[in-house]
Structures are given as C-alpha cells and as structure tokens.
Amino acid sequence: MATLDGINVKDIVKVERTSVHSHITGLGLNDRLEAEYVSGGMVGQVAARQAAGLIVKMIQEGKIAGRALLVTGEPGAGKTAIAIAISKELGEDTPFVSIVASEIYSNEINKTEALTQAFRRALGIQIKEETEVLEGEVISLEVDRSANGMGPKVGKLTMRTTDMETIYDLGSKMVDACLKEKVMPGDVIQVDKASGRVTRLGRSFNRSHDYDAMGPKVKLVQCPDGEIQKRRETVHTVCLHDIDVINSRTQGYVALFSGDTGEIKAEVRDQINKKVLEWREEGKAKFVPGVLFIDEAHMLDIECFSFLNRAIEGELSPLIIMATNRLIEKVRGTDVESAHGIPSDFLDRMLIINAIPYTKEDTAKILSIRCDEEGVKLQPTALDLLVKLQEATSLRYCIHLIAASEVIRIRSKAEIVTTDHIGSAYRLFFDTKRSEKILTEESAGFLQ
C-alpha cells in the first residue's frame, strides 16, 4: 500500500487462475512443421506434436473436415495437452468444443441429440456485413433542452478528419447515445448509421495537452483521415447451434442465455442447413468447420458410435478428436472387446496419434515450466526431489505439490521452496499408491 499526500492508495492486485494446462500456448512448431523439444509450453512428444501440426494445417486449409482423430496413451502422457495445443494453434476464429464422453448421458435429452448439439457448436459460420459508419474527431457537441425538461432533446455534432469537417443534426436518440458514452470535444468516435450506436475510440493526440493527468483507460489515437462517412465490412462468427436455438422457438434467444435448449427438431436444422449452403454459394457467408474434442472416448456406447459413423460423413461435419487411456476394453453396451473400447469399424475411419510416456528429462522440464507459470521459486535440489517423486507417484500429483509447497513456504516465511517444504506437502497429501496401501492395511476399519 502506497501513501500519496497522506492518503493511503491500495495497489491493484491482478487475480490470475492457473489451470493444469494454462502454460500451453501452442504446439511449438517451426515454419517447416518440425517440433522443437521445448516450445509453446510443450515438452517432448515430438512425433505426436508434428502429427498434430499436420492436422492443424489441414484444418486451416479446409481439407480434413468430417474426419476423426484418436489420441491414445497412458494416463499423464499429455493427451489432453495435445488437444489444447491444437485449439491454441487454430486461434479464436475456429470453433473448438471440448466435452467428456459421460456428458452426453442425460435424462432431459437423448444421447444422439446431445452429440448433435456438440457437433453444431463445433461448426461455425462467418457472416459478412457491410455497415456505414461516421468516424472522426469531435469538435463540438451542442445539446438543446426544452425549458421544462420534458420535451425531446436535439443537438448538433461537429466532426472532422484531417481532410474535412461536417456538422450533423442530432435527434433525441443520438443525443442520449452521445451523453451515455460521455462524448466530449477532442474524442475520436465512431457512429453506426444503421443502429445509432456510438463508440469512443479514444482521445485525439491533438488534445493530449488539455489535461495534466489522465486515467489509465484514456487511449490516445490519431485523428482519422479521408471522408467522415465510410463503409466498413464486419465479419460475425456464430456457431450453427446458436442459430438452431434461436430458430427453434418464439423466444429462442432467451434459451440461448439460460442454457435450457431442450431437443431441437430435425426440420429446423434442415432449413438452417439449406440457408447456410445458399449463403455460401452466394458469397454472403463462409463455412468454418471446427473441432469437437471428446475426452474419455471409451465411455461412449455402441449407439453413439453408430451415430458418429454416419455423422462424420455428412456435408456439415467438424473434425472429431477423441482421447482415451484404455488398451483393450469392452465396447460399452456390448460384450465385444476392442482396442481402446472403440468398435473396429469406427477405428478404421480414424487417424491415430500415440502419446508416448514422458522421460525423466521431460518431467523435469515440465515441472520447471509449471513453477514459472505459478510464480514459484524452487531450489535445484527441490526440483530434483519432485522428479524422483514423480517416478514413484505421478506427474499430476507432483504438479499439485508445487502449489501446496508454495503455501507452506509462505507460512514459514522462507524466500524459496526447499526440499523441506516439498517433504511437508508430501506427508500431508497422499498419492494414489499410498492411499491404496493404507486402505489395504486398515481395511477392517472401513465399511464393506
């Protein structure tokens, strides 16, 4: 807390949540799609990352929509990390929907409807819209109010660019919009002619000396050039599921926010598909096939796989990425055993990426990256201890120990996390193997 002229000023504390995969920023590939050993928050898994990079390239070029990809490997081998890295590489414009296979089982909607909704959320459409806007620096804003304050407000707005200056007469709606945005002379604004929406772009550099001090939210921008009235092309990206929900009932947009979508009729989706294909042929819209990631894919039953068999071959279908850690498993709903718990006919349609277990060096680097992500300083000996513990426990358990050790370090008022702090956290929190051992030794005391 700082003191300014006898007044206590509190520092603004930025709260950031760090998840298990928050350190991942991409696949870490170069221009030739070759994976670097440590890059983008990813460590090792060179072959798997290169394969995922090829998938990303084909998605961006629109060559692999309607396919299925399976990521296999042991627990803790980085399967989900690869999927998240793919989503980061694709960017915000490409829809990426992540679900767990058990999510589709519900009493409210059937399995195929839940899968269809997930499919449609992973299908985007970019709609182009041309709008006319007024953009310039405000020279003056005059508002005339009636004497009793009850009548409509009118006003005049003077705007200029580097090339011209114009005066506009404002009605009551535009006056209210300007007052709501607190528009004042020197502001650079943008007015949408169709909707009347006023947007403050910032403060003009020409008026930067009007005040000695300005708040952190004040943005200084150049005065626009050219004509005040311009045509702007805006691209809106929406998913097909949102369009389905809005058109499924009278007040569909309410269900869009509440999440109570229910089952949507096939006729509604067929009409939307026809309209989307028409827009694509006319050049009004661009179809963006996204990615549907299904974790724990072995939890899907035979009915889901039979539905997916046909769904991935449709004209409007995203890329499906599945992940599983099972070897040989019975296909749910049958007595037939198959690799990864997935029917053989569906496996034949998939490209398979194998995530190999991390080496000791990989683990040390991952733990070091996690420490940097969480802002924890470790002694070299403490990091070595974590690597040894990982061999006896698991990588996830050791990642959890980092945060616990940091709390113990703060309580003991030490400057850096040592082996003693790691040991204290290890004794307080049990891993799976030690917990199973205690259950076996003290089984008589538990309810059977």
From Swiss-Prot:
Tissues where the protein occurs: Expressed in gonadal cells.
MF term (GO), any: ATP binding
Enzyme class: hydrolase
Outcome of gene disruption: RNAi-mediated knockdown results in gonadal detachment during gonad migration. RNAi-mediated knockdown upon tunicamycin-induced ER stress in a cdc-48.1 and/or cdc-48.2 mutant background (insensitive to tunicamycin-induced ER stress) restores the expression of ER homeostasis regulator, ckb-2.
Record-listed E.C. numbers: 3.6.4.12
Any Gene Ontology biological process: box C/D snoRNP assembly
Binding residue positions for ATP: 73-80
Protein name: RuvB-like 2
Location in the cell: Cytoplasm; Nucleus
Pfam family, any one: TIP49
InterPro entries reported in the protein's UniProt record: AAA+_ATPase, NA-bd_OB-fold, P-loop_NTPase, RuvB-like, RuvB-like_C, RuvBL1/2_DNA/RNA_bd_dom, TIP49_P-loop
Organism per entry: Caenorhabditis elegans
Cytoplasm listed as a keyword: yes
Reaction catalysis annotation: ATP + H2O = ADP + phosphate + H(+)
Record keywords, A-Z: ATP-binding, Chromatin regulator, Cytoplasm, DNA damage, DNA repair, Helicase, Hydrolase, Nucleotide-binding, Nucleus, Transcription, Transcription regulation
